[in-house]
Amino acid sequence: MRIALINENSQASKNPLIETTLRKVVEPMGHTVDNYGMYTADDACQITYVKAGLLAGILLNSGAADYVVTGCGTGEGAMLACNSFPGVLCGHLVDPSDGFMFAQINDGNCVALPFAKDFGWGAELKLEMIFRQLFGFGHGNGYPPERVVPEQRNKKILDQVKAITHRPMIDILHDIDQTFLKETISGEHFAELFYPACKDEAIGAYLKAL
């Protein structure tokens, strides 16, 4: 699985800590991590939580990422922004049990974490435990065991609902404010990470043309 890390600007200084912790957990599992920044608070590309949502939508709908880890001060804004886009099912994770239950019950492809609220002493240990619970036990297996069948059924129903209520990502890219879109994909390493991994020719071609 290719996991993309996105940090919004208010918590950019924590990117190295989050990346190191994420890699420590998931790379031994065979997963790959692509760090889309922000890398420092002074980066030229300033990713707000709304841009984090747009970037998550681009990565997941193009196939350039299989999973997105993002967040903001509370995680709420990033979660709301991510869920604004088609093909993105984002959960808000506060503790390790959230990680396990979101993976098993909701089977999403994106998570938003609070990187300021309650992010104090031992934060890297909490992150490590969340990532182990999120990625270490598969996805969509249900919890508790007696709820597996209805939970898996409801997930399929939710996917069908989202397919109806959301527009195709390529249409959104055409209609969204183009300056906002250009700013979102102007990260230092966006091109070198995104284009080789992109599986959607229409999305890739449109963004490259910008």
Regions found by a protein language model. Give the residues of each.
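C-terminal binding/interaction regions
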Residues: A4-L17, F100-L210
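Short, structured active-site "lid" loops
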Residues: T48-Y67
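Short glycine/serine/threonine-rich phosphate/pyrophosphate-binding segments
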Residues: N15-P16, G53, G75-A81
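Short, ordered loop/turn segments at secondary-structure junctions
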Residues: M38-Y39, G73-T74, S97, F115-D118
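Short, solvent-exposed amphipathic alpha-helices that sit
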Residues: K14-M29
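Short Gly/Thr/Asp-enriched flexible loops that form oxyanion-binding sites at enzyme active sites
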Residues: G77-C90, V94-D95
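A short beta-strand-loop structural module common to alpha/beta enzyme folds
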Residues: M29-Q46
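A short, small-residue-rich loop immediately preceding and capping a beta-strand
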Residues: A65-G71, C90
